[in-house]
A protein has these predicted regions:
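OB-fold single-stranded nucleic acid-binding module
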Residues: 1-102
């Protein structure tokens, strides 16, 4: 089924919406105004991004995961895709992000 296919983070259409599985290498990580971002391309304004609110970040930390440590890793992300400075998934729980390759 194409609807459940894993999408390449570099090729996710900006206007796509719905529940998606997206896989790619995290190019950069940053925390800005208490929100953490995992950027998958050179331009965060247009490339795929995962966002973690402060409440979600606390859940990751409770599991012993520093979200900033995803930098450089190949990951698969599950969640509702929306358009905000390019395609974005807001991760609310650590189980949404699976490390495929260190």
């Amino acid at each position: 089924m194409q609807a459940y296919a894993v999408r390449d983070a570099a090729a996710v259409p900006a206007r796509l919406s719905g529940f998606e599985l997206v896989e790619g290498r995290v190019a950069e990580t940053a925390t800005v105004r208490k929100r953490t971002y995992l950027n998958f391309g050179a331009d965060w304004r247009s490339d795929f991004t995962v966002s973690l609110a402060p409440k979600a970040r606390k859940l990751f930390e409770a599991e012993g995961i520093d979200p900033l440590s995803y930098r450089g890793k190949l990951v698969r992300v599950r969640g509702w895709l929306k358009s905000y400075n390019g395609p974005l998934i807001e991760a609310t729980h650590p189980e949404q992000i699976e490390v495929i390759e260190e």
